[in-house]
Amino acid sequence: MTKAPIAGNRTGRKLGQRVKNKKMKASSRQWLERHINDPYVQRAQLEGYRARAAFKLLEIDEKHHILRGARRIIDLGAAPGSWSQIAAKVTGSTDDDIRVAAIDFLEMTQLPGVKILQLDFLDPSAPEKLLEAVGGTPDLVISDMAAPTTGHHRTDHLRTMHLCEVAAHFAVEVLGEGGHFLTKTFQGGTERELLAMLKQNFRQVVHVKPNSSRAESVEMFLLAKGFKGRKAEGEAEEA
């Protein structure tokens, strides 16, 4: 069971630390204080994960069992790589038998058992390169992609929703029957067309907000389980 970390008793670092750097802007100092005092950040360091985001995936899996039996996984917006770490472990991926492909336009340090593509997912060549990298039909596509924020809520929401839509269409194109799709989204409404498309192609579609997401964050996750196969998509087009 993925439990919430207990403050300060496992990492050797107490919570409630203050940053005493008068040269830093107040906003930067507040961000750094929140980061170093975040129990999930401390737990990620203790357990060897590259980011606290690992616990979001583990928490979602604890309830929805999307990692169970996964043989090949594609990780979109993967940097710095904590989801890919989990994916490599559950699939048994090794450098000699790659079963996890990860993509991000940001540079990522290499991970055992993960084929990393430093490439914008919106690049037209990305889908083919990902399929080649993962070495077969994936049964899970996970996306933690979010557009760089502008400070304008509506603009940020629309840009991230576009990434969700592109990722969803990619998942429908590549998943094996029975596969799952998980993507980050923002509170503020999921586009009606996207939900309709997912419900047409998957047996269950739900919104999830794991406890490890910061309370003040507008992020949520959209989970589509049980891909019906490309036959379902074809039947919808004919109707």
Curated annotation (Swiss-Prot):
Q: Which Gene3D superfamilies match?
A: Vaccinia Virus protein VP39
Catalyses: uridine(2552) in 23S rRNA + S-adenosyl-L-methionine = 2'-O-methyluridine(2552) in 23S rRNA + S-adenosyl-L-homocysteine + H(+)
Task: Give Gene Ontology CC terms.
Answer: cytoplasm
Q: Where in the cell is it found?
A: Cytoplasm
Quick one: where is this thing mainly located?
cytoplasm
* Keyword Metal-binding included in the entry's annotation: no
Q: Does the keyword Methyltransferase apply?
A: yes
User: What are the alphabetically sorted keywords of the record?
Assistant: Cytoplasm, Methyltransferase, rRNA processing, S-adenosyl-L-methionine, Transferase
List every stretch annotated Disordered.
1-20
User: Per its database record, what is this protein's job?
Assistant: Specifically methylates the uridine in position 2552 of 23S rRNA at the 2'-O position of the ribose in the fully assembled 50S ribosomal subunit.
> According to its UniProt record, which protein family does this protein belong to?
Belongs to the class I-like SAM-binding methyltransferase superfamily. RNA methyltransferase RlmE family.
UniProt-recorded name of the protein: Ribosomal RNA large subunit methyltransferase E
Give the organism, scientific name: Rhizobium johnstonii (strain DSM 114642 / LMG 32736 / 3841)
Gene symbol? Answer: rlmE
